[in-house]
Amino acid sequence: MSNHKLIEAVTKSQLRTDLPTFRPGDTVRVHVRIVEGTRERIQVFEGVVIKRHGGGISETFTVRKISSGVGVERTFPLHTPKIEKIEVKRRGKVRRAKLYYLRNLRGKAARIKEIR
């Protein structure tokens, strides 16, 4: 077996199949497992997906939310076991793959139309 086939087989076994399909513009709730010392808890991060990057085992997505008037962005690896689950709250209608322009918009201007 060649190296490429071996790497492909190993990464294919590591991919998660239990995650929903979502795209940039969707509002999602990401349930992340946080380890603090010996304790473990679930933290929920809810916001708009502004980008998806990469493919395969190294695919990531970035979620943006406004917390206390400050924009917070967090990038998650898609296939990490630290993600407990992802809930899609709203489907957004956008015409771009990367929604970086949302960083400059405030309030109602930063809203995204919902797909019916």
UniProtKB/Swiss-Prot annotation:
Gene Ontology terms, MF aspect: structural constituent of ribosome
Cross-referenced PROSITE patterns: RIBOSOMAL_L19
Gene3D superfamilies named in the record: 2.30.30.790
GO biological process, alphabetically ordered: translation
Alphabetized Pfam families for the sequence: Ribosomal_L19 (PF01245)
Keyword RNA-binding annotated: no
Keywords from the named record: Ribonucleoprotein, Ribosomal protein
GO CC terms in record: cytosolic large ribosomal subunit
Function: This protein is located at the 30S-50S ribosomal subunit interface and may play a role in the structure and function of the aminoacyl-tRNA binding site.
Protein family (similarity comment): Belongs to the bacterial ribosomal protein bL19 family.
Protein name per the record: Large ribosomal subunit protein bL19
